[in-house]
């Protein structure tokens, strides 16, 4: 069995696979990282850990400490020029975030036509993946929660809003929430224009904020939970077969 780890800015997502089968999956906040040891204890057949980490060196060290029971150090995946049928056309391929890279690999395995790969969380990433497997570039913007916090922290009279989304807001809280959410959806739809004319073009939408965006998108899309974990599974299986 293999333990997959997606250490993000807010949460640590995990999954356990055996061959093609998913055995278990879940998520922890950073403060609960030691509980990864319980996952190891519950799955005594674990032999490898494969993961991505964008949360920094301290979290990486805490994860490694919690997973000592596996018997081998975590294999952290980093972006490269090519892997699992995806070619990285970033100006400096190694600079691409590991989570974005692995999400692209997961998307390639799920959808062979042109696609827009969206991961909506603390930050929102929107990446263009060609039918050829070429990653043609993408954008990063603050997630909805960060946008709301930026308004609250950098203006004198705007609070951290707990409003709701409406088409034409008539109060400040709703105006902030609706504006931030429209900004997310608008960025996604604008990026989709680059591939909208291509056969089978589709958006793959993942991340903790995906549910809030679904009702706003006027483009073909599929909701894919834990796309980074799915990409890690592709990487782990390819390595095992090599």
Curated annotation (Swiss-Prot):
Chain positions recorded as substrate binding sites: 90, 97-100, 172
BP term (GO), one: coenzyme A biosynthetic process
Predominant location: cytoplasm
First-tier enzyme category under EC: transferase
Keyword Kinase included in the entry's annotation: yes
Its biological purpose: Catalyzes the phosphorylation of pantothenate (Pan), the first step in CoA biosynthesis.
Family per record: Belongs to the type III pantothenate kinase family.
UniProt pathway: Cofactor biosynthesis; coenzyme A biosynthesis; CoA from (R)-pantothenate: step 1/5
Species assigned in the record: Aromatoleum aromaticum (strain DSM 19018 / LMG 30748 / EbN1) (Azoarcus sp. (strain EbN1))
Localisation per UniProt entry: Cytoplasm
Subunit and interaction comment: Homodimer.
Taxonomy, superkingdom: Bacteria
Keyword field: ATP-binding, Coenzyme A biosynthesis, Cytoplasm, Kinase, Nucleotide-binding, Potassium, Transferase
Originating gene: coaX
The protein's name: Type III pantothenate kinase
Catalytic activity: (R)-pantothenate + ATP = (R)-4'-phosphopantothenate + ADP + H(+)
Molecular function as annotated in GO: ATP binding; pantothenate kinase activity
Record-listed ATP binding positions: 6-13, 122
Biological classification of the source: Bacteria, Pseudomonadati, Pseudomonadota, Betaproteobacteria, Rhodocyclales
Cofactor(s) this protein cannot do without: NH4(+); K(+)
InterPro entries: ATPase_NBD, Type_III_PanK
Note describing how the cofactor binds: A monovalent cation. Ammonium or potassium.
Enzyme Commission number(s) from the entry: 2.7.1.33
SUPFAM superfamilies associated with the record: Actin-like ATPase domain
């Amino acid at each position: 069995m293999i333990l997959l780890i997606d250490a993000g800015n807010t949460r640590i997502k995990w999954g356990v696979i055996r061959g093609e089968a998913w055995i278990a999956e879940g998520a922890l906040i950073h403060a609960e990282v030691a509980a990864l040891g319980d996952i190891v204890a519950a799955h005594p057949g674990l032999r490898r850990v494969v993961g991505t980490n964008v949360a920094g060196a301290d979290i990486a060290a805490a994860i490694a400490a919690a997973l000592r029971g596996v018997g081998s150090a975590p294999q952290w995946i980093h972006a490269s020029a090519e892997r699992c049928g995806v070619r990285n056309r970033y100006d400096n391929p190694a600079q691409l975030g590991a989570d974005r890279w692995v999400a692209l690999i997961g998307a390639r395995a799920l959808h062979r036509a042109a696609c827009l790969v969206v991961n909506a969380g603390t930050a929102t990433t929107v990446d263009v993946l060609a039918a050829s497997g070429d990653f043609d570039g993408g954008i990063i913007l603050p997630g909805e929660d960060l946008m709301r916090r930026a308004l609250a922290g950098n203006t004198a009279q705007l609070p951290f809003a707990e409003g709701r989304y409406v088409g034409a807001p008539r109060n400040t809280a709703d105006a902030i929430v609706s504006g931030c959410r429209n900004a997310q959806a608008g960025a996604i739809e604008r990026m989709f224009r680059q591939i909208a004319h291509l056969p089978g073009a589709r958006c793959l939408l993942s991340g903790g904020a995906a549910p809030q965006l679904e009702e706003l998108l006027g483009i073909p899309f599929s909701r894919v939970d834990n796309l980074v974990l799915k990409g890690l599974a592709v990487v782990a299986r390819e390595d095992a077969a090599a």
